[in-house]
Regions:
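N-terminal, leucine/charged-rich tether regions that mediate assembly and partner docking
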Residues: 1-144
Length: 144
């Protein structure tokens, strides 16, 4: 019997509509459209470190995982009630799991392109692991 196991995947809140900590605005409609339009067979969003990705596979800044699915939901309770949340299902590499287990780069930051080349609509191009998320309400990344 082989040791093949399914990769660990988990869904996290990666962005919330409204003002960011640095004064930018995330549109709820953009988050909903990005979730609706996301198709990793068309363009798969990779997880990176601090919005940097190295062309070298053994670099500390190599890809850390993949976004396998997106969904958007309205928040109905708590201090962020009335806003839209974007959730990402992430398939992490072992390195990503190790970093988050160590408490490093435990939050996320989306890379949202407002006009994707396929259809001119919002699309998530990547997702960064960070210690300083711009969006309010991001969930801690934890896979174990």
């Amino acid at each position: 019997m082989g040791s093949a196991t399914k990769p660990a995947r988990k869904k996290f809140r990666v962005a919330v509509s409204g003002s960011t900590i640095d004064g930018r605005e995330i549109s709820g409609e953009h988050l909903k459209a990005a979730a609706k339009n996301y198709d990793p067979t068309v363009y798969g969003a990779r997880v990176n470190v601090e919005h940097l990705i190295s062309p070298f596979p053994n670099s500390d800044l190599c890809a850390m995982g993949d976004v396998t699915a997106l969904s958007a939901e309205d928040i109905t309770e708590g201090p962020l009630s009335g806003r839209t949340a974007l959730y990402a299902e992430i398939e992490p590499t072992d390195r990503m799991k190790k970093l988050t287990d160590e408490g490093k780069k435990i939050y996320s930051s989306i890379e949202l392109h407002p006009q994707f080349s396929l259809n001119g609509k919002p699309y998530i191009m990547g997702l960064a692991m960070t210690d300083t998320p711009a969006s309010l309400g991001t969930e801690r990344l934890k896979f174990a």
